[in-house]
Amino acid sequence: MIFWQRLVFLFLLAFVPLKTALALDCYFGTSGGATEKFETVNAFAVPSSAKPGDKIWESDDIKIPVYCNNNTNGDFSSEDVYAWVNPYPGIQDRYYQLGVTYNGIDYDSTLGKNKIDTNQCIDSTKITQYTPQEIAEMGWQDKLCSKDPNNIHQYRSFIARMRLYVKVREMPPHDYQSPLSDYVIVQFDGKGGINEGADAKNLKYHINGLNNIRVLDCSVNFAITPPNQVIDFGTFSDRDIRLCSMTRTFSIKTTKNQSGTCTDGFKVSSSFYTDETLTENDKALLIGNGLQLRLLDENNQPYVFNKYTEYADFTSDMLIYEKRYTAEISTVAGATIRTGPFETVVLFKINYN
């Protein structure tokens, strides 16, 4: 009997600090906003050319407006906000591996939950009972985010950017139906861990529709012109680029697998992807020297970077599809142009649908 009493006592002690460590609220968009958000992905497909470890699908950029407040740490300390990716990694599939790309880094769900510092810090609500002078006299500046008693932050608003992806563990059979459905890609919480309480006010972002994965007996091949995949703008002066933008063209040719085993019809969506800073509603990439890059379609309309749109439709008898693009560089309004060589990298990515 004594033994069981001691076990219960130790169990309670272990959980008492946890309530303090998880003293942080995060919402979608604004204070008191939703703490559960759901996004449904469109059906996608696995090409027959997929190999173990390949990414066979990824989402568009998911930009989540996050508002965090109510740091109730009893010791008056500030609290850092963390994005806990793959917070509930238990969901698994024999053939598919889920993961999250956050700030350009991939986090497979097999690695378990990962905490990522959002570089956002919130001061304790309790410290506001003291004046800045009293905080300084007690030597509590180090408990503050800014270390300045006159600069207290009780809430933060920021945008978190990430992508969900699916990799192939091993090639599934043609008629395979995945059990994957709802998946929480991120939860915003404190550094102490994720709050799983029923009354938790910690924003979770769900993706559902992952069970709509189709397995194809087909694939496509790509050929980019120029073959070296380098768009060279040559040499030009500061004056030249100020007078007018510079353009170069390139094309992408797509060929459907023509083997006798290919019987499925499918569509292909594409995205021009970059980790660089974007502007103009993500339609222009800042090169970093006072210039910007846009990619234009046949109607001279700019593409949105990091967003998938329909590229080619192979549901008919079409076997070859070629599309022409224009790369345009121009000045950034109000920016100083720095002369010298420059380069930027853009990836052409596809999803099968």
Predicted regions: what they are:
Residues 8-17:
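Bacterial N-terminal signal peptides
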Residues 1-8:
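Bacterial N-terminal signal peptides that target proteins for export
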Residues 22-353:
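Mature extracellular/passenger domains of Gram-negative fimbrial/pilin and adhesin proteins
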